[in-house]
Amino acid sequence: MKTLLRSAAAAAAIALTAAACGSGGSAEDPAAAPVTLRVFAAASLQEPFEELGQQFESEHEDVTVEFSFAGSSTLVEQIQQGAPADVFASADTKNMDKLTDAGLEETDPVDFTTNTLRIAVPAGNPAGVTDLASLTGDLNLVVCAPEVPCGAATETVEEAAGLEFAPVSEEQSVTDVLNKVTSGEADAGLVYVTDVEKAGDAVEGIDFPEAQEAVNTYPITTVDGSANPQLGQEFVDLVTGEEGHKVLAGYGFGGA
């Protein structure tokens, strides 16, 4: 009987060893599996976030940062509809409030940078734009739609200046506005300071005092139901930390 028991125990041990080998042979394998961190961010953040994403990947082996850049209102809508996201960075507090009101934030949002509007015109300024009042003249003006942060800021400066614009189109992201200016489809567009900076010689920027009436504050948070909450928080920490501020400042963003 003892021999039978020893034989059964030995057989069980062999079976367990074989099962472990068949499953990869190591408890470390799941941790080494590739992970995708999904970051939803306002279109105006594309360049600095891509740089920070590369840095994050270099510090986290087997992690890929996948970005979705669009208008903040569009991104909130996608998250509300179930799109998988680990981190959300908005170009204003209004759209972040939509996320928190729906209970879709994992942690309290943190304000991490600011941005203001600037007039963008094609190189050479063919329409002769000089200030905000010039945008009410006979020209093709393109702005952001009111539900987008840059559109809400446009309405604020319009009201502050006592003007009424008649844009030929209202776009869903500040990038779309800039593209219409650089392509020559528009004589002028209201975009962020950072967008004028990144466009280089393709556009000229015109500052106006009313821009200070609409300083956009950018908050960031991890998203409730995230598949990677710890990694998401580490990315938020990178953005809100010293290195994040340094990178953002390099693209023309202001302090929070």
Language-model-detected regions and their locations in the chain:
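Soluble periplasmic/extracytoplasmic beta-strand elements of cell-envelope proteins
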Residues: 38-40, 66-68, 87-89, 98, ...
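Short, high-confidence coil segments that cap the C-terminus of an alpha-helix
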Residues: 62, 84-85, 186
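Short, glycine-/small- and polar/acidic-enriched structural segments
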Residues: 109-118
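Exported/periplasmic ABC-transporter solute-binding proteins
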Residues: 3, 21-45, 50-54, 73, ...
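Secretory targeting and sorting signals
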Residues: 1-25
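Extracytoplasmic metal-acquisition and chelation regions
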Residues: 23-26, 80-84, 114
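Pocket-flanking alpha-helical
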Residues: 73-104, 128
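Signal peptide-proximal N-terminal region
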Residues: 54-66
